[in-house]
Amino acid sequence: MSVFINKDTRVIVQGITGSTALFHTKQMLEYGTNIVGGVTPGKGGTEAEGVPVFNTVAEAVQTTGANASVIYVPAPFAADAIMEAVDAELDLVICITEHIPVLDMVKVKRFMEGKKTRLIGPNCPGVITPEECKIGIMPGYIHKKGHVGVVSRSGTLTYEAVHQLSEAGVGQSTAVGIGGDPVNGTNFIDVLKAFNEDPDTHAVIMIGEIGGTAEEEAAEWVKANMTKPVVGFIGGKTAPPGKRMGHAGAIISGGKGTADEKIKTLNACGIEVAETPSVMGETLIKVLKEKNLFETCKTH
């Protein structure tokens, strides 16, 4: 088991003929992801990396039976690309694109109300179920199949946590990058719920950062509902107030959203928080050992 994606996920790539999309399409295919088509308006009938290209998402879905899409469309056109995928009734849309205007995403969120599609991102590294399916831009080779779920607002911190776990012989069920923008499709709680219900996930690492209250809300949810151990990390301890730190959502405003505040809430909700990024894996392994879960989480 895993969450959101597996070896049977049938993927289309929106914006497939762009250089970034072509590079990552090749990487995803090499990993074993089942990419069944691509979409670039005006390029229908051609091929990219051996994958058929269509003019519209609807046409691609109708022809290939795709149930998921990954979007590498430039920011000014990305919101339209998401809505086109939602209109085509895909189960899952993963948007990698950064710098989508916030107002565009507000419109997308409203458009998606009551629709069946789950959006992950934007401004995210994607989702990977190790040794089955990789959708996005993460380096596949650092992942190992196993029982730890990873959910994060940061791409590179996800890779850091995953690499530490894999090096210690602890595999992952699924790693989900929810993205660093203030308005996104899937939040921490959505992913934690999925991990909680997944029999193959035995523990979770949640990686947050300054800005907003998503981590605090997730911690309260964990305290009330989670049956599996969760370990946390919060980036941005030394960030000055009022300065955006890399991600559009990573900003301390009005004294709210500081790392200290978040860490305090996580601790109060029973979530052990790693002091620095370099001990994220170590902190989880310590908790696994305390709960006698380490052996079941080791990849044999």
Swiss-Prot record:
GO cellular component, one term: succinate-CoA ligase complex (ADP-forming)
Protein name: Succinate--CoA ligase [ADP-forming] subunit alpha
Catalytic activity field: succinate + ATP + CoA = succinyl-CoA + ADP + phosphate; GTP + succinate + CoA = succinyl-CoA + GDP + phosphate
Keywords per UniProt: Ligase, Nucleotide-binding, Tricarboxylic acid cycle
One example GO MF annotation: succinate-CoA ligase (GDP-forming) activity
Assigned EC number: 6.2.1.5
Pfam families assigned to the protein according to its UniProt record, in alphabetical order: CoA_binding (PF02629), Ligase_CoA (PF00549)
Source organism superkingdom: Bacteria
Subunit architecture: Heterotetramer of two alpha and two beta subunits.
UniProt: substrate binding residues: Y159
Species whose genome carries this gene: Bacillus subtilis (strain 168)
Family: Belongs to the succinate/malate CoA ligase alpha subunit family.
UniProt xrefs under InterPro entries: Cit_synth/succinyl-CoA_lig_AS (IPR017440), Citrt_syn/SCS-alpha_CS (IPR033847), CoA-bd (IPR003781), CoA_lig_alpha (IPR005810), NAD(P)-bd_dom_sf (IPR036291), SUCC_ACL_C (IPR005811), Succinyl-CoA_synth-like (IPR016102)
SUPFAM superfamilies named in the record: NAD(P)-binding Rossmann-fold domains, Succinyl-CoA synthetase domains
Pathway membership: Carbohydrate metabolism; tricarboxylic acid cycle; succinate from succinyl-CoA (ligase route): step 1/1
Catalytic residues, chain numbering: H247 (tele-phosphohistidine intermediate)
Keyword Nucleotide-binding part of the UniProt annotation: yes
Binding site for CoA: T17, G18, S19, T20, K43, I96, T97, E98
GO biological process: tricarboxylic acid cycle
SMART domains: CoA_binding
Protein purpose: Succinyl-CoA synthetase functions in the citric acid cycle (TCA), coupling the hydrolysis of succinyl-CoA to the synthesis of either ATP or GTP and thus represents the only step of substrate-level phosphorylation in the TCA. The alpha subunit of the enzyme binds the substrates coenzyme A and phosphate, while succinate binding and nucleotide specificity is provided by the beta subunit.
